[in-house]
């Protein structure tokens, strides 16, 4: 079993090295846009690493965006064996975790919340003028 600090160090190493590997070694033309690793969570036994990714640089509709994210996750999950092998060469540990890629929805949720706040701020003067009458 690994301690909390060790898990954090391992997650940070995996995130740093995977970011570099995806940028430099993964040459799939279907990976349009910038794939960013927003976080990594390593299981206590170091058997798995859940990798959370976002895709930036694509201006698409919501439906197209969802399809693009799914396609990106499929590409990354299919390349996970290669990425794990390369990762094991870069980080010198006895166990290299299996990689599971997930889409990180925090950016999308943040944009959604920002839109709601912006709409509320725009409606505020309208409501104040209605209250005065």
Curated annotation (Swiss-Prot):
It is found in: Cytoplasm. It comes from the Bacteria. Keywords: Cytoplasm, Ribosome biogenesis. One of its GO terms (biological process) is maturation of SSU-rRNA. Gene3D superfamilies: 3.30.300.20. GO terms for cellular component: cytosol. Its main location: cytoplasm. The keyword Cytoplasm applies. The keyword Plastid does not apply. GO terms for molecular function: ribosomal small subunit binding. Pfam families: RBFA. PANTHER family: RIBOSOME-BINDING FACTOR A, CHLOROPLASTIC-RELATED. Belongs to the RbfA family. Monomer. Binds 30S ribosomal subunits, but not 50S ribosomal subunits or 70S ribosomes. NCBIfam families: PRK13816.1 (NF010389), rbfA (TIGR00082). One of several proteins that assist in the late maturation steps of the functional core of the 30S ribosomal subunit. Associates with free 30S ribosomal subunits (but not with 30S subunits that are part of 70S ribosomes or polysomes). Required for efficient processing of 16S rRNA. May interact with the 5'-terminal helix region of 16S rRNA. This is Ribosome-binding factor A. The lineage of its organism: Bacteria, Pseudomonadati, Pseudomonadota, Gammaproteobacteria, Moraxellales.
